[in-house]
A protein has these predicted regions:
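Structured recognition/catalytic domains enriched at protein termini
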Residues: 1-112, 118-217
C-alpha cells in the first residue's frame, strides 16, 4: 500500500500530518518448492529491516536534503526504519508487514518513497555491512500546503486488520473533502478523526470471507 497525499509540515515539529495512507509493505518469499511451514518460519526471522527515503517524482534523485538555510534538517520526519510485524491481512492470510505510520514531509511537491530491505547479519559485528536484498519505489504522491490539503483518507481494511492484532498503526475515519482545496484540516495531531469502531466490527481479519489469494501492496 503506497501513499497518495500529505500535508507539508514546514520546518517545525508541531502540528504535523503524516503521509496518507501510511505505507505498508509486505514481504513475499518467491520459492515455489518451499514447504509452507518453512515459508512461515522465514517470515518470522527477526533480522529483516526496511529503510525509507524520499526521492524525486522521476525516482532518479534523492530528495532527503534541504536547502542551504536548513541543512541540519531532513525533508522527511518520523520513523524511517521499520521492523517486521507478522500477522493476518484483511483476508485472513498470513504475512510479514513493514509499517511506516509516522512519516511526514516538510515541503510541498510531488515525490516518491524508496524502500530498501536489508537482512541483518547476526551477531552484528563492528563495521559489518548488510546486504540490500530488495528495493521498491512507491507511486508518486503529492504534498500539499496547509490551505490546499484535501484532508485525510479513511484507514484501509489492511491497516485496521493489523491494528486489531496489535500492530502500532493508528486508524482513522478520515476527513477527505473530495479532493478540493481550501478550508481547515482536522485538529487531530495526525489529521482525521480516530476510528472508534468496535474491535469486533469489520476489523478482525478472521471475520471476513476470504477471496482469491491476491496481494496488493
Amino acid at each position: 500500500m503506497t501513499p497518495s497525499r500529505a500535508r507539508s509540515c514546514g520546518f517545525g515539529d508541531r502540528d504535523r500530518r503524516v503521509i496518507d495512507p501510511p505505507p505498508i509493505l509486505q514481504l513475499q518469499i518467491d520459492a515455489p518448492g518451499l514447504p509452507r511451514e518453512e515459508i512461515s518460519r522465514k517470515l518470522r526471522l527477526p533480522s529483516y529491516v526496511v529503510h525509507c527515503s524520499i526521492w524525486s517524482e522521476s525516482g532518479e534523485e534523492e530528495m532527503s536534503g534541504m536547502p542551504d538555510d536548513y541543512t541540519r534538517q531532513k525533508r522527511l520526519m518520523g520513523s524511517l526504519v521499520a521492523s517486521p510485524f507478522v500477522g493476518l491481512d484483511e483476508h485472513g492470510d498470513e504475512g510479514c508487514f513493514f509499517c511506516f505510520p509516522d512519516i511526514s514531509c516538510r515541503t510541498p511537491g510531488r515525490y516518491r518513497l524508496k524502500f530498501v530491505l536489508v537482512v541483518l547479519d547476526w551477531p552484528l559485528r563492528p563495521n559489518a555491512r548488510s546486504i540490500i536484498r530488495a528495493e521498491l519505489l512507491s507511486d508518486v504522491f503529492q504534498t500539499f500546503s496547509a490551505k490546499d490539503f484535501p484532508g485525510m483518507l479513511e484507514s484501509t481494511p489492511l491497516a485496521k486488520a493489523l491494528k486489531f492484532q496489535g500492530c502500532n498503526i493508528p486508524t482513522k475515519k478520515g476527513n477527505d473533502r473530495g479532493g478540493g482545496g481550501g478550508g481547515k484540516t482536522d485538529d487531530a495531531g495526525v489529521g482525521g478523526s480516530e476510528d472508534k469502531s468496535s474491535d469486533d466490527e469489520a476489523v478482525s481479519p478472521r471475520s471476513r470471507k476470504r477471496p482469491r489469494n491476491t496481494k496488493n501492496l
